[in-house]
Structures are given as C-alpha cells and as structure tokens.
Swiss-Prot record:
The species this protein was found in: Acidovorax sp. (strain JS42)
Protein name: Alanine racemase
UniProt keyword annotations, A-Z: Isomerase, Pyridoxal phosphate
Cited InterPro entries: Ala_racemase (IPR000821), Ala_racemase/Decarboxylase_C (IPR009006), Ala_racemase_C (IPR011079), Ala_racemase_N (IPR001608), Ala_racemase_pyridoxalP-BS (IPR020622), PLP-binding_barrel (IPR029066)
Keyword DNA-binding belongs to the record: no
Pfam families reported for this sequence: Ala_racemase_C, Ala_racemase_N
Domain of life: Bacteria
Record-linked HAMAP family: Ala_racemase
Active-site residue numbers: K35 (proton acceptor), Y256 (proton acceptor)
Amino acid sequence: MPRPILATIHPAAVHHNLERARRAAPDARVWAVVKANAYGHGIERVFEGLRAADGFALLDLAEAERVRALGWRGPILLLEGVFEPRDLELCSRLGLWHAVHCDAQIDWLAAHKTQVPHRVFLKMNSGMNRLGFTPERYRSAWARLNALPQVDEISCMTHFSDADGPRGIAHQVQAFQAATQDLPGERCIANSAALLRHGGDAQVRLDWVRAGIVLYGSAPDHPERRAADWDLQPTMTLASRIIGVQQLQAGDTVGYGSRFTAQGPLGIGIVACGYADGYPRHCDTGTPVLVNGVRTRTIGRVSMDMLAVDLTPVPGAGLGAEVTLWGRAANGAVLPIDEVAQAGGTIGYELMCALAPRVPVVVQD
C-alpha cells in the first residue's frame, strides 16, 4: 500500500478563478499564465478549467507544444521570447506570439527566413529591471521591429514590480504611457496583483491582462488580503493521514533538535508528510494544519518524511485521520496555502511549484 499522501487538483476551482479575473478587468482579454507547468499543477490537469481563456502565456517551447497537443488553437505567448535563433522556426510552425526584450532577439528576427510573419510583444523595462528595453530605447526598438518584413504585428507590454506593495504602479504606468504614446498595437501591463487591485482602471487593464497566481487560488497581496477576500478558491489540496500517535508528558520533546517541549500531557499525531514531499522545512511549531477538517498546529521540526501535529482540538483523531496540509478538507474547511507559506517564510507560489515528484496527484472536481 502506498504512503497516504496525495495532492488533488481542482479544475472547477481554476475555472472559477479565471472568471473572477475576468470580472476584475472587464472588457480586457485574459492570458492564462501556465508557466512552470501551470504553477506546479500540471498544464494537462488544469486545461479544462482554462478553456475559456483568450490565450495561454508560458515560458518555453515545450510547454507551448503541450498546449497545442491539447487541442488549443488560440493565441499562445512566450513571455520571455525565444532563447536562440532556431526557436523562431518552431514559433512559426506552432503559430506562437513571443516577447521581444533585447537587441539580440531583434537581430535573430531580422535574419530569420519565414513565410509566416511573427506577432510579437515588445517588452519595456519600466522599473522591474529584469527584461525589456528602457523607456529611452523603447521607441527605437519598436521602429527596428516595425521595419522587418518578418514581423506582422507589434504589441506593447511591461511588468509591474510592486503592484501588491506600497510603492504601487503609478510611476510604471506613466513611463509606459509616455514611451508608447501614439504607437499602434495592443497593450498588456497588468499581472495578477494589478488586475485584482487596479483592474477597474482602464489605464491598467488595457487590451490584455496576465492572470497568473490568481488562477491558482493564491492571493498576490497576502497577508494584507486573503484569497477568500478576493473570492478565490483553492486549486490544489495536499492531504495525508496520521500514521502514528504519541502521548507526551511534561518535559517530553518532539522531533530533531528537540525544538518543542511539552508543558503537560499532550497527544500528538505523526503525519506522513515531510520536506521531501514539498512541505516547507522552515514551518516551525504553530503552522496551521487541519485534522479531520479541524484547525490545529504543527509541533516541532518538519523532517524528511514526517511531521507532528497537536491533537488537542481533535481528541478523537487517531490512526488514519485525515490531515490537510493546505487546500480543502473533506468537510469543506479550507486552509489557504498562503498561510502555510507565510509560516515557512515563503509564498504560496513556491509551495505549488515545489510539490515533489513522489507525491501522487489526482484531478477532482
């Protein structure tokens, strides 16, 4: 019999979150961002929940081929563009749109022989300082692309560095507007945080929005706001079961390093889940967890294959009791992945992407 740990993906929740993104940015078309294998969920597992998207945005050609293999005939955007000249041939064959963020990519297009002109998104570095042309160089890059017979349509895009933070987006919006003024083509600047917080602003939603983490039920601005505050549903549940029970007395310690000491009699459950499954090792005593749908806490240090939970709120729980590490329990109770991530000093994005290959995954609506 296999270990009782299991990850469950919920395509219906993905669909719900996609529709929530649409409501946040009325009249804009939605790129469903499925990079990093749909944020660890599996592109094939969430595809049905995303069929209503206007396009798929991702990182590499292998992911694009997988989306096409699923029968998608609409737009697909390579968010980082091509990584070498020969990639352009496959872009043409698959009908991909791709970002252009540096001079080398323009040079590759200029040298590319094709009968199918490319549709590109010219990326501006408006303050993120990762990829893109600075505002001062943006128009000259646009002119170079516009002169190429290999390019059919040029759209404009940028990425916000602090859409969910105190600095905000006004300075980047202003830089983008100034550099793209009077240039033809569609616009795309809003990521998940921007579309939730500023999607009602026509200067932000523009023609396209990029829905990423919002699709997967995580709040981009947690802990200021929770996923439920945005009407987002959990799309991944990680669950296991209690495989052992211990009755502690005052002075007993738990786990490696004896980081927890019982102050009195205490029942604990040992759960078949550890950092080798993708659960964050930095989650110390007090991290929220659900046992039979009842909220309790972890006890002591997370080990490779196991962790301990406090059974005080669920005294009847024993061997085989359901443990929800994040997501939705059988009784409908929800433990947001963002809460677990915060306890581990990270973000929900990372936990989704870090789910270990040894964890079985099923799809359930």
